Amino acid sequence: ALNTAKLYGAKKVLFVTKLKAISSILKDFEAIQKPFDMYCINYESLHKCESDFDLIILDESHCLGQYPQPAERVKELKRICTDKPIIYLSGTPTPESYSQFYHQFYISSFSPFAEKKFYEWHKNYGIPALKFLYNRQINDYSKTKKEAVLEKVQHLILSYTQEEAGFTSF
């Protein structure tokens, strides 16, 4: 992602990640000889962030996929990311359901989905279902029309195996 930012010609990059990953990212940034200004922050500190970046990198972006309501960090990112290019990084972009794509892309002005609210999105891409939770019947928003969702997002996704990405097994 850092090399992509360099190739893009970014001048000021916001890199959002988990707290424990910040030191590793800063080390990688040193290795590419700091070709741009970078602000590396964890998701819990987004409220301190301005929106004057020309590129946003979101590590572990699957953590933005809560539904049906957006998490506070998603609302903060929507404010920061308006009209900005975003690079999403995740080993598991939809660990539980394709519904998790909605809020990941919701923060982008360039979302492949036209729907402004999750419930509108689910009417088009979801499969109505119910589930029981604590002896109560509630809507289950995890069921989706997988092919329809993938048709919208597939052109935005690059997939690599661990081996292709340079990771080795022990």
Segments the model singles out, each with a brief description of its role:
Residues 2-3, 8-29, 96-100:
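Conserved Walker A/P-loop ATP-binding site and its immediately adjacent core
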Residues 2-4, 28-31, 53, 70-74, ...:
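Short, glycine/charged-enriched secondary-structure capping and boundary segments
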Residues 12, 37, 85:
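Residues at the starts of beta-strands that form the adenosine-phosphate
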Residues 14, 38, 55-56:
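Hydrophobic "anchor" residues on beta-strands that sit immediately upstream
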Residues 32-48:
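Inter-Walker segment of RecA-like/P-loop motor cores
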Residues 55, 73-164:
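Conserved P-loop NTPase motor "coupling/switch" region that bridges the ATPase
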Residues 59-60:
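Walker B catalytic acidic pair
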Residues 63-68, 95-96:
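Catalytic P-loop NTPase motifs of RecA-like helicase/translocase cores
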